[in-house]
């Protein structure tokens, strides 16, 4: 086995290992009550991270194989033999023009679709009629997308595979005939009633319309409504261009995004359609920052400033803040955001989360050394007004609590009576426990009732912090 084949085999094992990781994550979630309140990582975030790594590794492997083979003039066919390292079955189905088999094979391996997607365009090119191959694959599996099964996991996988096939077809710019368009039109008319308010259905439908150039069969208003429905997907802007929406329609869409609070989606459409002159992206980004700040305050207030709610509000604001920072860096508009100090705001919010976590550990019941009066007086602080940073939305930094020593020093102890008053220790006056020096003996005198102590100031010592004595009720 060559080095490339060994690496490819390891990449293929990523999906299997992810399933084991998901099982461990589910087991961890079963004990969520024992986890820190700041632990809010979801499986979708973990899956997205490893899928991105898998795709990146595969691309680098293909680049390495291609570059090494391009330097060898005597073996020009090495590229074709080495490139489909991971999924040679794709090419077999395409060479046989077996669209139904291709669709079923991809659905069965839908959990590895990101890896498959890297090789799919080149595999489809091996078919005599790529457009017919894709239609055969869709028609052969379309029964899975019926309304009765639309909520099943398999139906969701089917829609994702349809999108991958249609994206690959758009990428290779395959030849289309009238017969193929008629077949696609029939599928589109059957598909449309199932869309409703389901973005995944709208995404597949729009890819079908774009791939087979069916935009003229539907009203522009319908197309815009469906694009608005799929606006969270990164393919939305590409679909707009492929279907052929004019600039005015896209401008109406952008305004609709702004009116409904989807400011970052509007920013994406503005930049990718080169509409900076019609809108003001810097102002929109600053409005997004303001909205995220106000939303965090509102969430904290509605949740009575509980620790969980504060962490959730901080996480949402951090997410919005990082999204703005990403756009600012990608578009090289850092100079417009000098006053906002975005990176410093991120650091402050992260510090607040860490500080709350430390305070939670210190005040937890597992800490047996915390005195009673501190637990009683340790009330939840409210939001600090007038803080130095704009993004200080939750609790202000907490000062670490100072614990008194477990055993007071002899010079700081005076005997008190059961009512909390100092007992008389004048010469010749009896005290309940005999000589006052007995207080400092190695064996304490027996007490007939509880005795309470108040810390006193020794000679030459600064006055201690006032702590009211505890009186039994």
From Swiss-Prot:
Composition bias type Polar residues, residue spans: 361-373
GO biological process, one term: cell differentiation
UniProt keyword list: Coiled coil, Developmental protein, Differentiation, Flowering
Cystine bridges: none
Location of region: Disordered: 356-384
Job of this protein: Involved in flowering time regulation. Required for FRI-mediated up-regulation of FLC transcripts. Partially redundant with FRL1.
Protein's name according to its UniProt entry: FRIGIDA-like protein 2
Protein's gene: FRL2
